[in-house]
Amino acid sequence: MKEENEYIVKRRKKRRRKRITIFLFLLICILVTLCLKLPYFNIKYINVEGNKIIKSDNIIENSKLKKGNNIFYLNLNKYKDNIMQDPYIKNVSIRQKLPNTIDIIVKERQAVFYINSGENYFIIDKNGVLLEIRKNISGMNLIKLDGVTLKNGKIGTEIPCDSRRLELINQITSVSIKDNNLKITDVDMSHILSLKVYFKNMCVVIGTPDDIYNKLNEAVNVIISQKLIDKKGYVDVSFKGNPVYSLQQ
């Protein structure tokens, strides 16, 4: 009799657990359906962060994200790929913030150099990535690259150039210049073992590319300390020892 009662109790507990499981499953189904159908979860706000070059409206337009779509129906990878089509975008992430907000966080590439070929100006970033081809670069404040021949290239990829020159392009941009009036205007890579960097009319003779960071910093210190910013001449840091400079009259 005792065993029979225990069996009945176990069966009741089992049925109760089954009913609870079914109830929870149905409740979850109802909640999911409501989330997918209720206007409460439709996209109302799309925010863009991290952009200084590309307008927020352009990024949103390129993403193909639409207000009014359900926030749970999004294929985030598709929208990321859409945004990454712009060569000025280096990286992007998209966050869903319940109930109705999308945050787009971008990291941009910055135009630093240009290569002139005929009537075209090839705009590249510090890593040698081709950002665009223009007919006019007025107001862009870019550094001219000499000694790199470029007739074509695929936008959004590295320019067809040897690895040593690509590395130098990156290293040159890492030099810290504290004087806002002193800016690199031209880099001559015509001869990889006889590099030259120009600050307006002041030529810095780098020589071989080894230790280019320290060489450039030494030259910058000389130009600033000797007040050579608006002068014409050269600073030679191609050898070991103190830099030498000479001015043209």
From Swiss-Prot:
Residues 41-109 form the POTRA domain. One of its GO terms (biological process) is FtsZ-dependent cytokinesis. It is found in: Cell membrane. Residues 41-249 are extracellular. GO terms for cellular component: cell division site; plasma membrane. Residues 1-19 are cytoplasmic. Keywords: Cell cycle, Cell division, Cell membrane, Membrane, Transmembrane, Transmembrane helix. It is a single-pass type II membrane protein. Pfam families: FtsQ_DivIB_C, POTRA_1. Its main location: membrane. It comes from the Bacteria. The chain crosses the membrane at residues 20-40. Cell division protein that may be involved in stabilizing or promoting the assembly of the division complex. Belongs to the FtsQ/DivIB family. DivIB subfamily. This is Cell division protein DivIB. It comes from Clostridium acetobutylicum (strain ATCC 824 / DSM 792 / JCM 1419 / IAM 19013 / LMG 5710 / NBRC 13948 / NRRL B-527 / VKM B-1787 / 2291 / W). The gene is divIB.
